Amino acid sequence: MTDEPALESAALPVLCLENTSAVYAGGVVALSRFNLEVQAGEFCVILGPSGSGKSTLLRLISGLVPTSSGTVTIGGIKMAPPTRRKARQRLGMVHQDHGLIDRLSVLDNVMAGCAGSLPFWRLMLRMYPRPVVDAACQLLDEVGLTEAQANRRARELSGGQRQRVGIARALMGTPLLILADEPVASLDPQTSRIILALLRRAAKDRGIAVLCSLHQMDLAREFADRIVVMRNGRPVFNDCPAELSGFLERSAIPPKRSGAA
């Protein structure tokens, strides 16, 4: 576990994209001159149809997709050589497929979230310092998992429980920013609300910026501080949930309910 990272300046947004583009082989434009800022403590939701660029956007922010132009900064640190590693240390990820190691215990999966701050031999032998174990147990308690569940293998948990573990693991590295890529895509509406409430609470209680992609418009309205709607690799709406209805009426995009596929 690392010390809480600090912004280089209190005035800076946690996440900043400036005129950022991503072009794939063959000239396919995945993102085009994308501008976005997310502040500390803000829960921002990305909406858009399949192929609009939501996943590409999150992969670009995390450094997995290179920028063709423009910049991505996390806490004032550029997600580009030579500072990419430092920028990634300020980032936590919550994946659609949980991203857990099934054969490891729930507790071990959470402690793996601080892998970047521990010697490699400790990770290989799973010999974690006592403060790391205590912090992981505290996070599991915060996301609603018991001590008995902490000692079970990850594969024994339900989908909702596994996603709780994913959130705890993302918080383990004391990030400035959490990226959540369709974190409730395979969950029922009730469990989806529990998971999104945990992410929102992380933003508010810890001052973390959270950027979350969803396809359920009603859940975005319920939980988001701000909604960004994407179309063809560009943002076409960037405002508070209260303004979304007017945008939908003007653009004739039908809302998708949380129970829909």
From Swiss-Prot:
All residue ranges annotated as the ABC transporter domain in the record: 15-257
Q: Where does ATP bind?
A: G48, P49, S50, G51, S52, G53, K54, S55
Q: Where is this chain primarily localised?
A: membrane
The UniProt entry lists membrane topology as: Peripheral membrane protein
EC number(s) per UniProt? 7.3.2.2
Fetch the PANTHER family from UniProt: AMINO ACID IMPORT ATP-BINDING PROTEIN (PTHR43166), PHOSPHONATES IMPORT ATP-BINDING PROTEIN PHNC (PTHR43166:SF6)
Q: What is this protein called in UniProt? A: Phosphonates import ATP-binding protein PhnC
The record lists the organism as Hyphomonas neptunium (strain ATCC 15444)
